[in-house]
Amino acid sequence: MEQAPADQGPQREPYNEWALELLEELKSEAVRHFPRIWLHSLGQHIYETYGDTWVGVEAIIRILQQLLFIHFRIGCQHSRIGIIRQRRARNGSSRS
């Protein structure tokens, strides 16, 4: 009968420590790009929905990741990541 191999990898930090560190990084990045009132309202919504649980932590991590990804993809003024906006000719002569 087959058995799973023994865990031979490096010791990983506990999930809750990793999640809290990730949340802190996301929060510090989010306050540089979004109004604090928006972030406070988001935090209140998560707290009212999930309470003080790990499910709430996971939800806010997921939402902040999505918000930051979309923000950068659209073209954040603070970042070089995003869509490159090209000036278009008014008469369309730049098309081949």
UniProtKB/Swiss-Prot annotation:
Main location: virion
Record flagged with keyword Transcription regulation: yes
Location in the cell: Virion; Host nucleus; Host extracellular space
InterPro entries from the UniProt entry: RetroV_VpR/X
Highest taxon above the source species: Viruses
Other remarks in the entry: HIV-1 lineages are divided in three main groups, M (for Major), O (for Outlier), and N (for New, or Non-M, Non-O). The vast majority of strains found worldwide belong to the group M. Group O seems to be endemic to and largely confined to Cameroon and neighboring countries in West Central Africa, where these viruses represent a small minority of HIV-1 strains. The group N is represented by a limited number of isolates from Cameroonian persons. The group M is further subdivided in 9 clades or subtypes (A to D, F to H, J and K).
Assembly and oligomerization: Homooligomer, may form homodimer. Interacts with p6-gag region of the Pr55 Gag precursor protein through a (Leu-X-X)4 motif near the C-terminus of the P6gag protein. Interacts with host UNG. May interact with host RAD23A/HHR23A. Interacts with host VPRBP/DCAF1, leading to hijack the CUL4A-RBX1-DDB1-DCAF1/VPRBP complex, mediating ubiquitination of host proteins such as TERT and ZGPAT and arrest of the cell cycle in G2 phase.
Function: During virus replication, may deplete host UNG protein, and incude G2-M cell cycle arrest. Acts by targeting specific host proteins for degradation by the 26S proteasome, through association with the cellular CUL4A-DDB1 E3 ligase complex by direct interaction with host VPRPB/DCAF-1. Cell cycle arrest reportedly occurs within hours of infection and is not blocked by antiviral agents, suggesting that it is initiated by the VPR carried into the virion. Additionally, VPR induces apoptosis in a cell cycle dependent manner suggesting that these two effects are mechanistically linked. During virus entry, plays a role in the transport of the viral pre-integration (PIC) complex to the host nucleus. This function is crucial for viral infection of non-dividing macrophages. May act directly at the nuclear pore complex, by binding nucleoporins phenylalanine-glycine (FG)-repeat regions.
Membership in a protein family: Belongs to the HIV-1 VPR protein family.
Full protein name: Protein Vpr
